[in-house]
């Protein structure tokens, strides 16, 4: 599925192809919470890095999160003008980029269930739906990948 996204001021616009467009993964880690500023969590989508096209590249900056006394290898790309988080690129998975659903302008399909992950890092003020068939809870990361989740449900496009 072709996804188009942008920052708030539209100085940076991008497009990419995603086989995994369902916004199901809600991450409550402090990094996602603080870099996206949305509801205490971020919902990350996965896209093919070889299809990433960017307009306004000169307006991009990136941030490497502080982790375990050092810096993460992952780069969180932002707009220099308005500060919108646009995507994460991690050398551990060089074939993918991970834009937050909030940066996507294309209408996304509704996920049939949600995964709430990194709940061990959740801020105390953030409400989380009770665990159920439709809302799975994980203290850290689940074993199933974004790709695996989509494939198991026949949603991989």
For each predicted feature, which ranges?
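A short Gly-Trp-Pro
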Residues: 1-6, 11-157
């Amino acid at each position: 599925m072709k996804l188009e996204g942008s920052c708030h001021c539209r100085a940076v616009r991008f497009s990419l192809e995603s086989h995994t467009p369902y916004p199901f993964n809600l991450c409550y880690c402090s990094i996602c919470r603080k870099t996206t500023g949305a509801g205490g969590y971020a919902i990350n989508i996965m896209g093919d890095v070889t299809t990433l096209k960017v307009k306004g590249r000169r307006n991009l900056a990136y941030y490497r999160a502080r982790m375990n006394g050092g810096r993460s290898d992952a780069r969180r790309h932002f707009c220099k003008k308005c500060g919108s988080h646009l995507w994460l690129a991690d050398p551990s998975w060089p074939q993918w980029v991970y834009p937050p659903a909030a940066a996507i302008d294309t209408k996304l399909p509704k996920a049939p269930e949600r995964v709430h992950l990194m709940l061990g890092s959740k801020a105390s003020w953030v409400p989380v739906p009770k665990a159920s068939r439709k809302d799975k809870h994980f203290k850290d990361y689940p074993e199933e990948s974004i790709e695996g989740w989509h494939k198991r449900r026949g949603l991989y496009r």
